[in-house]
């Protein structure tokens, strides 16, 4: 999180992300990821006040004391923004293999204790089938529009609308702790041999 901020401060107008016909400067990515972090924070995901996390020595090697947020997405600027936005909100993003069937997705969301999901529209039919089977419902579902035609999932919030309405100003307790323990939780999807 802090590396993105440092580069944006030094070269705000330089290209940061180029995806298809869209070009985003470092300043634009800084702004978009801060706004996304605010959306995540306001949903009650991640630290809500200054508080110590569970010390690493009190956790097993595979455990995380932070909130987890699922990235059920294709590659694109929104994926990178989501990773950075999660870190800026003090949460841990993790990947979801978009080839998963409902039972695999249910297992992953349950095992990870996902508190939120950012999902491309094309994957909402599988997610919609899984949501009623989860014991713990996500606090936030952000949906990235695409050309699939499925429409907005009930209870979901449009990604672009959410970040457009959010403030880029974050609570100081979040910004003071950036990058001290940024993590990315990686679930293998069984595609290594493909």
Predicted regions and their residues:
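Solvent-exposed alpha-helix faces
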Residues: 34-38, 113, 193
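Conserved AMP-binding/adenylate-forming
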Residues: 22-23, 39-103
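Structural core segment of the AMP-binding/adenylate-forming
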Residues: 42, 88-166, 173-175
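Conserved S/T- and glycine-rich ATP-binding loop of Class I adenylate-forming
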Residues: 69, 86, 117, 182, ...
């Amino acid at each position: 999180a802090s590396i993105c901020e440092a580069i944006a401060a030094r070269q705000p107008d330089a290209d940061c992300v180029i995806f298809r016909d869209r070009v985003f400067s470092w300043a634009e990515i800084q702004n978009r990821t801060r706004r996304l972090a605010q959306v995540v924070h306001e949903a009650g995901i991640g630290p809500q006040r200054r508080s110590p996390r569970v010390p690493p020595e009190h956790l097993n090697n595979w455990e995380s004391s932070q909130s987890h947020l699922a990235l059920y997405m294709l590659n694109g600027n929104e994926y990178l923004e989501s990773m950075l936005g999660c870190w800026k909100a003090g949460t841990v993003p993790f990947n979801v293999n978009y080839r998963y069937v409902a039972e695999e997705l249910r297992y992953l969301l349950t095992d990870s204790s996902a508190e939120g999901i950012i999902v491309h529209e094309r994957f909402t039919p599988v997610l919609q089938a899984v949501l009623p089977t989860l014991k713990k419902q996500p606090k936030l579902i952000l949906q990235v529009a695409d050309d699939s035609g499925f429409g907005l999932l009930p209870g979901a919030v449009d990604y672009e609308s959410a970040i457009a309405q959010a403030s880029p100003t974050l609570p100081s307790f979040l910004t003071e702790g950036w990058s001290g323990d940024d993590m990315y939780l990686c679930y293998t999807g069984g595609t290594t041999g493909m």
